[in-house]
Amino acid sequence: MKRISLLALSLLGCLLGVGSLGAQSVDGRPSFRQGLWIGAHGGVMASRFGFTPSVRQHTHLGYLGGLQVRYDIERGASLQVEVNYQRTGWRERYDASEVSYSRDLDYLDLPILTHLYLDLGGAKVFLNAGPFVGYQLRESAQLTGKSLMGAQDKLRHELTTRYPFFWGLGGGPGISIPLGRRQRIELEGRFVYGLGNIFSTERTSAYVQSSEMRFGLTMNYLFRLR
């Protein structure tokens, strides 16, 4: 009877040992568990336009706010989808202080990003990269000193958006800090290069290029659902 009891205890010990090994990866780290995160983010976005012929500009300052969903696919890699409302545009530079012009462009954006990260024992450093698509919802302009502007400037200011769809490539680095077991806060830098134009690109058009570059800084909050 004692031998049977010892054998039963030995089998139980082996099963527990196998279970504990199943909870670890080959290198001794805890096994990876896929997770689903939801969150919100906001920040400052700056933008400039590449015009041909060129236009002297200051950096245009805008903002970004939105929601995001992140799914951890495997250790070190996730898929992230965002829905953002953001203001971009351009601000022109003139020598005369009484002359100014800026245009605001409001977009609804949908970035689809690969999220690559390195776990540093709680804190993480990461890199996001992928395509950005969006649709322009509205545009507005502010100007002073119109009578002092040249004919080319006035012509440009009369142009409205011909192509409201935005598409481009972008991403950026960031750092993620845990707030307990299910929450994280992140600081992220971002750069987006637009591949399309807002004005007509026909040969007879005033500007054959009118593409956008965006760059900025956001703060992200994420909560793990599972």
Where are these regions (language model features)?
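Positively charged n-region of N-terminal signal peptides that target proteins for export
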Residues: 1-4
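Extracellular loop and loop/strand-boundary signature of outer-membrane beta-barrel proteins
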Residues: 50-55, 95-101, 155-161, 202-207
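Short glycine/proline- and aromatic-enriched beta-strand/turn motifs that initiate or cap beta-hairpins
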Residues: 22-68, 224-226
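Predominantly the C-terminal beta-signal and adjacent terminal strand-loop region
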Residues: 82, 166, 171, 178-226
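Gram-negative (and chloroplast) outer-membrane scaffold detector with strong preference
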Residues: 24-28, 32-37, 70-147, 181, ...
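Residues that define the transmembrane beta-barrel architecture of outer-membrane proteins
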Residues: 34-36, 57-63, 104-110, 123, ...
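Bacterial N-terminal signal peptides
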Residues: 8-17
